[in-house]
Amino acid sequence: MKNIELASKDLNALNVELTELLKTGFKLRMQKGTQQLTNTSQLGKNKRDIARVKTFIAQKTAQK
């Protein structure tokens, strides 16, 4: 997910994106716990994407 894509989205779309990322993160953690996750770098990427989306949500909220 690129910063340009996130900057062009409105607040509602960012909240939907955040919800999807949180669900994906939960699934990845469950796969890791059951030893089914083969690519553990997905966890870090997901965490960074969540932080990125939360940052844009905070910026959009501060602008209003």
UniProtKB/Swiss-Prot annotation:
**In Gene Ontology terms, what is one molecular function of this protein?**
structural constituent of ribosome
Q: Which UniProt keywords apply?
A: Ribonucleoprotein, Ribosomal protein
An example of a Pfam family matching this protein is: Ribosomal_L29
Q: Does the keyword Ribonucleoprotein apply?
A: yes
Recorded hits in Gene3D superfamilies, A to Z, give:
6.10.140.1970
Top-level taxon of the source organism: Bacteria
InterPro entries per record = Ribosomal_uL29, Ribosomal_uL29_sf
List, alphabetically, the GO terms of the cellular component aspect. ribonucleoprotein complex; ribosome
| GO terms of biological process kind | translation
Q: Which family does it belong to?
A: Belongs to the universal ribosomal protein uL29 family.
NCBIfam families reported in the protein's UniProt record = L29
| Entry protein name | Large ribosomal subunit protein uL29
Q: What's the gene? A: rpmC
